[in-house]
Amino acid sequence: MKRTIQGMLTLACGIFVMTDQTVWERAASADGTTPSERALATIARKAFLSLWSYTNVFTDEGRHNGKGDGKELCDLLVVFGNSVLLFSDKDCAFPRHSDIKVAWARWYRSAIEKSARQLAGAEKFAKAFPQRIFLDKGCVSLLPIALPDPSVARYYLIAVTRGSHQPARSYFGGGSSGSLMLLTHLYGRDHYEMPFHIGFPLDSRRFVHVLDEVTVGLLLEELDTVPDLVSYLSRKEEFLQQSDLVLSVPGEEELLARYMATTRDEEHAFPNIPSGTNFVALPEGDWDTYATSPQRVAKRKADEISYMWDGLIEHQSSFIRAGTAITAPWQPPGVVDHERIVRALAEQTRLVRRSLSADLRFALMQSESGRMFARIKMTGRPPSQAFVFLTIPRVEGEDYDTIYRTRRIHALTVYCHAVKDAMPTLTEAIGVASEPLSEDMASQDFIYVDLSEMSGNEMKEWRRQADDLEILRPKTEMKLFRDSEQEFPAPFEFAAPPPRYLGVGGRPVNRAERRQAEREQRRCRKKSR
């Protein structure tokens, strides 16, 4: 069934007087109850944007006859379409003990094991009782975003554990980054015997992403959109859970570096492991190589324009949370799913946002009296999604709401439907309409159209309306080009493929042994010259 969703926000020069905040607004501005939770909330809000991230949500477990406080579900909940991210944040001091294994086991139980069990319980509850999650401990305000149906939902469990960084640096020595190592043959209690190594904390082998105080910031700053982060988490789980293969990684940041520097079918990926391999160890130092590379510097510079897109999403979200988002004049406010509109904008990766922002800015710069301007961006191969950026100057004397805005919404609606005639493979269209930047005041209309099903008669009707507006016609001057922008302005490759390391008896080597092996390899190379 074809769906058309429209919404509007208004921007104008002037002073806004804030009234009482809505429950949704208060939830969006909540910062957590501890310093570590506040730190997590800050970086998460930047990456996930405030419409989809909620700190310290609760269930009604423990309440009886409407009395008592609810039970905390998790420290941070992100709900975005079919993706649900559950975060636990624990800041535990590392115990002092002469035996590092004893100290590690105690810290591991309180920081990682406890977090993993909490996250597994939160996932189980959310799937079973999605209508019993609240924004407050009194369980008065329900979560405003509906959780996806369990049959299509994808949950990610993320344990942020603080307190191990400095002890790990001291333990590994030799300039170690101090991040927790990943070792995939460890399960449950196996961890007690391997200080600062993480495999699968849960006996069920349900995957838990364990991040420390350093790697959580690196990860959420490098992959600062929901689709980018979810792709990484999903592919990481696949990479580390390959059957009959043990992987040793000297820290989450090293894994992230390999992911960012490896592409397959124009998407980030992890290195291919040759068939028959039973153990692979990634080298230490890849993150430093990647982080200081001119390619990454150029990427971050090129990404700057993309945050215009984030600003557009966040600004519209503020109206949705406040309950003041406006609908088309002919639409009842209650039938508009404003969240779906802005989610369509937020579903774009950082790279796509870069080009979309450039296209939007170009459209806003166009201003010719009496003429509308449209720029259409299509994504996918073959194209499945169309973005329509439309600017229409106001005509002096016309009423803004009854004439100008109605005219603009009609034109945007026709564009977002009739574009299907020009590209039959399209399944959805997202439109943004505004006055040009040259105007002294501007507002934006947004529209989301599901084009997956459109009958021949519907297509003819939209074609007729497009002809009436003299748009998208065969004789209309259109410029078509393929966007060839690369994420890294220059190709990025590491100097060598990941080496494999095995210690005595086939056991995985630790950081110190790994460095010793690398020094010996360098000496051998020098002697052979």
Predicted feature residues:
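Intrinsically disordered, low-complexity Ser/Thr/Pro/Gly-rich regulatory segments
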Residues: M1-C74, V78-R514, R519-R529
